[in-house]
């Protein structure tokens, strides 16, 4: 890797397009750039909106109105909003169409003239998303952003944020290698993205011709996403369509400098702008959220399963450092970076319920009725057979008994029946969604990322400012003092 220059000097007077601007990772990226380099020229933030007014409202409510920006607000005081007004341009549009669906011709031409960096953070991360929606956003959306980037006259780098789990359910060491057009995970030949698109269109046309309801079409599209993903070897539609998106970028990048960032499971901020900021219920947060509420009594996980976690601020820092490291590197093979912890600082999945028990026993969640929710120790099952036995005895059989009793006694037990049915559905849904990762035996190789860390430490004075070494994390300390309190404050409350 070539010697890196100063990150702050690189960001100075640069114009950056950020897609998916209302997403949590994009917000952390925006906050970091504005706080660390106030001399950045412009941040163009793409938000899904049809007009300027709607976009401006979303920008305030979903981005700068968030607590995430409290440190920047404290630093700038009364000048915060004038600073944001000067440095940020809201862009109403969508990554699902040509030229990002921009209607303002003058703004579009300004962006093509001014933009130096494009960072694509837009995605739908729903594991059970409709196939048509996921294909449009995660796959073709990436291509639309690339096409827009190619029209930017001053472009120095295009950074695409994907996910490490495009690897599917591989075992052993998973290398930081790109995906090329037509590659499937199970060795099946004939994977063609355009064919997948045509299959979706044909199915929707067939359903509409038959007079299917929107609810029926939605359900069919969700089922189709799962079926097509598994047909080619991926466990769910999210990672499948993200892999397809990478294939399109590799196929059509041309001479554009491209870097692909593949984070693992993203958790709350480790240090900046303050520890513990998290937004929404992400993958791993289902455990503390449902356990803290007293709704999760058991958990299924392999005894040797390593859960690969990485705080969001480290992902953003790695993205910025990679952006600087590969700027202006045209006609070279794009470098892919795994940003995770399983290789450098692994944590066993089985430690999670134990830490959750310790935290919520000492710090019970206070429910909306102002009552503390007392939790018991969750049962942890290390195999599907023991879990299925538990499920049958404690949920499926009682559910069947209540169903029969309801029929005999004119719905007398309806309340209990519906409550148990909800709990059963929740448990089955969580297991189905996360089943591929509960016994995951892969370790994400981070050799490229380690080289990037070394290059940053050797070449730039701001290496400590843009930290992303997971070896700095004590997982027990992080969960008990940072992540769980953050989930309670920003999600549960």
From Swiss-Prot:
Its catalytic activity? a long-chain fatty acyl-CoA + 2 NADPH + 2 H(+) = a long-chain primary fatty alcohol + 2 NADP(+) + CoA
Give the E.C. number(s).
1.2.1.84
The residues that cross the membrane are: none
The record's section on InterPro entries has:
FAR, FAR_C, Far_NAD-bd, NAD(P)-bd_dom_sf
One of the record's GO cellular component terms = intracellular membrane-bounded organelle
The UniProt entry's GO biological process terms, in alphabetical order, are: long-chain fatty-acyl-CoA metabolic process; suberin biosynthetic process
One GO molecular-function annotation for this sequence?
alcohol-forming very long-chain fatty acyl-CoA reductase activity
| Family according to the record | Belongs to the fatty acyl-CoA reductase family.
**The name this protein goes by in its record:** Alcohol-forming fatty acyl-CoA reductase
